[in-house]
């Protein structure tokens, strides 16, 4: 997968936007959640293989790291909740698309997981 193909895939999600808040080296994909821009994907703009960081359920994150050499702890991110995926071809396209959607859904549904105090 090329960077333009990955960008197209990420920007197809509803209300997703591309930003560069950390400089030109990192493309950050965000979605509006109740008026706040929340990150769901980051892509390193330089180097090969492409590095894609995605939010992930903590238990699934560990399973993916154990199963795939190309799935690492999130680079410069909360390692419990983020994975960095090296796009080497080890993951099938449909699995990669599923992980992107999983990340996006975790971000937009996050308020449903916040504990409430009564």
Model-derived regions: residue spans:
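Charge-dense, helix-prone N-terminal extensions
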Residues: 1-118
């Amino acid at each position: 997968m090329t960077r333009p193909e990955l960008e197209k895939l990420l920007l197809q999600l509803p209300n997703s936007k591309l930003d560069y808040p950390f400089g030109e080296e990192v493309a950050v994909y965000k979605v509006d959640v109740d008026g706040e821009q929340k990150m769901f994907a980051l892509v390193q703009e330089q180097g090969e293989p492409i590095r894609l960081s995605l939010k992930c359920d903590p238990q699934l994150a560990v399973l993916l790291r154990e199963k795939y050499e190309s799935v690492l702890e999130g680079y410069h991110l909360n390692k419990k909740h983020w994975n960095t995926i090296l796009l080497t071809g080890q993951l099938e396209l449909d699995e990669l698309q599923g992980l992107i959607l999983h990340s996006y859904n975790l971000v937009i549904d996050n308020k449903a997981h916040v504990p409430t105090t009564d």
